[in-house]
């Protein structure tokens, strides 16, 4: 009987361990902008957020290649079809695919190497709205922000209605898009990096732009922090 109890306890502890390791995350997406933002998430969909409103999503454990982004200048009909000036995702309120540049990105992958979450802010698709991406639990305290006036200071070559394009979107060359995997900092990517040093400014900008927290951490994404 004692052996059976010991095995049962071990099994329960193992199940609890697996549950802890496999836990997803809660993301609180908050709009602090003085204008309406149509938040988008893949996975997750989309939601209109007026000033001060928030939206909760709960991506599952192991989610990767995921992102949250703000859309601006949107109009949707009662069926959730329409168009956005920035960040549009095939004309849908409930996004099923990534948005069109320019849009500021909060990217993440949960429960990855060493059971860590990886997260970043990326300007590889350009910039439309200032953003904060921060952990809110788990003892992880290193948040990241991109709050510079990038739209106002955007180089003429990169200007777009409602935002500032990344040079890859405009020029579509290997120098800026890193299609061959061999690229580095350029004057245009330096423009973004100087203003938002924690954010990705070009596709290979990994060393200074990727951050980690223990799996099971919860997060907030704030527009106009």
Curated annotation (Swiss-Prot):
Disulfide bond annotation, renumbered to this chain: 33-224, 74-84, 89-95, 140-213, 146-196, 154-164, 168-177, 178-183
Localization in the cell: Secreted
SUPFAM superfamilies: Osmotin, thaumatin-like protein
Glycosylation sites: 187
Pfam families, alphabetized: Thaumatin (PF00314)
Transmembrane segments: none
Tissue specificity: Woody stem plug.
Name recorded for this polypeptide: Thaumatin-like protein
Organism: Actinidia deliciosa (Kiwi)
Gene of this entry: tlp
């Amino acid at each position: 009987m004692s052996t059976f109890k010991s095995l049962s306890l071990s099994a329960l502890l193992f199940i609890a361990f697996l549950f802890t390791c496999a836990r997803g995350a809660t993301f609180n997406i908050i709009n602090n902008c003085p204008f309406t933002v149509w938040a988008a998430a893949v996975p997750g969909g989309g939601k209109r957020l007026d000033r001060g409103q928030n939206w909760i999503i709960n991506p599952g454990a192991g989610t990767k290649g995921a992102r949250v982004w703000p859309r601006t200048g949107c109009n949707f009909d009662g069926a959730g079809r329409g168009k956005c000036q920035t960040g549009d995702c095939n004309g849908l309120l409930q996004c099923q695919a990534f948005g069109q540049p320019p849009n500021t990105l909060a990217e993440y992958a949960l429960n990855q190497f060493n059971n860590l979450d990886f997260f970043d802010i990326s300007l590889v698709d350009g910039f439309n709205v200032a953003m904060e991406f921060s952990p809110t639990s788990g003892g992880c305290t290193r948040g990241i922000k991109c709050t510079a006036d990038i739209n106002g200071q955007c180089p003429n070559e990169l200007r777009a209605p409602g935002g500032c394009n990344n040079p890859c979107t405009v020029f579509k060359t290997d120098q800026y898009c890193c299609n061959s995997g061999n690229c580095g900092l350029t004057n245009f990517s330096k423009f973004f990096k100087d203003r938002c040093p924690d954010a990705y400014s070009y596709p290979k900008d990994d060393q200074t732009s990727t951050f980690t927290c223990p799996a099971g951490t919860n997060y907030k994404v704030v527009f106009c922090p």
